[in-house]
Every structure is written in structure tokens, then in C-alpha cells.
């Protein structure tokens, strides 16, 4: 099964474009499928038209990433969180923090910013600030929130494990790359491991692993993005973020099992 994000070409920002995905998938997909409705700063009416029984949720990029679907208008965010009956899935990075950090990096290195600056530009603080805002909005409006690809130790402290999964209104996921790589790997892997949110410190990685073990993070996902090796080999600002992980996720988790990180039972639980 797969659940596809809306930052495709074209972006799934209208009911017509969303339905087109379902129509095409019904003809060619060999797997179970579902699609997220996309949000932007100016398509609130389209988002609220979405039938929650037909989609896996609405996706909000609270920080700009691949596809340029940033939603940073507070009125729009309030409208989605207050008016939507769907699961709201958020990419949480604070855009202003990223822009400020990026400007400082460009002032020092120009267009030749080293990849090692990626977790400095898209910092842990940017993630925490945005995740905190998403949780504030969800709590205010009793919305069903799912925060995607948690990557920092500080964020893991936001989530609970003292209530049953079926009763949670706020859930979180981690992705394979944030469970595997650390910022020490940039020296050898370069832009090939450029993701948003960024791969961060070993302390962050280990905290995310522990949050999975303790059930504060509920799901392990792939964040699959089919970028080519040629695209990923560009300089920092030109190389797209993301990578193809559908085919690598389970082998990587089995390696983590053999390394004593996760039990097989935990892997089954978090990927099912």
C-alpha cells in the first residue's frame, strides 16, 4: 500500500486534480493506494470540499520543501485546523528560521554552501518551533494531527505514550533516513542524503529511535521521493531534497534489528 503526497506535477490542490490521481491509479496501480489533498495559502475552499472518506488526509507544508506548497498564512492554517474533519498531516519546519539561516550561509559561502550546513540551515529549532505551532493549533481546534518525519530530540518530548493509539488526536512518525544516518555521514554521502527535514546529530537520531521504542512516535514511514542520482549530485541549493526509500526501508530496518536497535515485533507494529 502507498499514500502519495500532493507535491507532484501538477500539485494536487484542487478536487479535479485529486480525482485525476484516483482515476489513473484505478487503471494502473498494482497496490493499494490513497492520496493526500494538498494545501496552499489560497486553496482553503478546495481543501474543505474534500470528502474525508476518500482521502488519507490533507497535507500541509508548514515549511517550504520540494514542490513549493508552503502554507504560512495563519488565517489559512486556522481555517484548515478548525474546519477540516480529515487527518491533517504536517511537514513541520519554520520557514522564517530557515530563510534567516539560509541568508547567513549564503553571505558566507555564496552558492557553494557545504552540505554540512544543511542541518544548520534547516535547524532543530526550526523543526521544534513549527511542530509546537501545529500541536497548538490541533489542541485549540481538537483537530486530528499527524506530524510527519520527526527528526530532533527536542520534538520527541512533545509526544505522549500514556494513552492508547486509537484515542490519540496527535500522532507522529519517523522516517528511515532519520533512523539510519547522522550529520557525520554528510562528509561521505554529500547531497545524496539531503532531506527535509535534515539528517541531524547522532543524539537526535538516537532520541528518535528511543521515541519509537517508547511509543511516543507511532509510525515508521519512507518519505519516498524518486529523485535521480544525477539530480541528487548537484550543488547544495540545486540538489533536490528527498530520496528513493520504498525499496530500502525494510532491509534497513532488518539491519537495525540485527544491530539490536529494534525488535522484530516493534518493526511490525510501526510499519503495519
Functional labels for PLM-detected ranges:
Residues 9, 62-154, 219, 224-228:
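Divalent metal-binding pocket/active-site signature
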Amino acid at each position: 500500500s502507498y499514500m502519495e503526497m500532493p507535491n507532484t506535477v501538477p500539485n494536487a490542490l484542487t478536487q479535479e486534480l485529486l480525482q485525476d490521481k484516483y482515476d489513473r491509479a484505478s487503471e494502473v496501480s498494482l497496490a493499494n493506494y490513497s492520496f493526500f489533498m494538498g494545501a496552499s495559502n489560497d486553496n482553503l475552499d478546495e481543501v474543505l470540499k474534500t470528502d474525508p472518506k476518500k482521502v488519507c488526509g490533507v497535507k500541509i507544508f508548514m515549511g517550504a520543501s520540494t514542490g513549493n506548497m508552503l502554507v504560512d498564512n495563519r488565517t489559512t492554517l486556522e481555517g484548515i485546523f478548525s474546519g477540516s474533519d480529515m487527518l491533517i498531516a504536517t511537514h513541520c519546519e519554520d520557514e522564517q528560521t530557515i530563510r534567516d539561516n539560509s541568508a547567513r550561509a549564503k553571505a558566507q559561502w555564496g552558492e557553494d554552501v557545504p552540505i554540512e550546513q544543511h542541518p544548520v540551515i534547516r535547524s532543530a529549532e526550526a523543526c521544534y518551533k513549527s511542530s509546537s505551532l501545529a500541536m497548538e493549533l490541533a489542541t485549540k481546534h481538537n483537530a486530528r494531527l499527524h506530524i510527519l518525519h520527526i527528526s530532533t530530540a527536542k520534538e520527541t518530548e512533545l509526544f505522549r505514550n500514556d494513552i492508547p493509539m486509537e484515542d490519540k488526536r496527535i500522532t507522529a512518525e519517523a522516517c528511515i533516513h532519520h533512523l539510519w544516518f547522522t550529520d557525520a555521514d554528510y562528509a561521505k554521502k554529500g547531497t545524496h542524503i539531503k532531506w527535509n527535514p535534515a539528517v541531524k546529530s547522532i543524539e537526535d537520531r538516537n532520541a528518535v529511535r528511543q521515541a519509537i521504542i517508547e511509543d511516543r512516535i507511532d509510525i515508521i514511514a519512507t518519505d519516498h521521493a524518486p529523485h535521480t542520482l544525477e539530480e541528487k549530485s548537484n550543488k547544495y541549493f540545486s540538489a533536490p531534497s528527498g530520496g528513493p526509500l520504498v525499496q530500502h526501508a525494510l532491509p534497513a530496518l532488518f539491519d537495525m534489528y540485527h544491530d539490536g536497535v529494534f525488535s522484530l515485533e516493534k518493526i511490525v507494529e510501526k510499519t503495519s
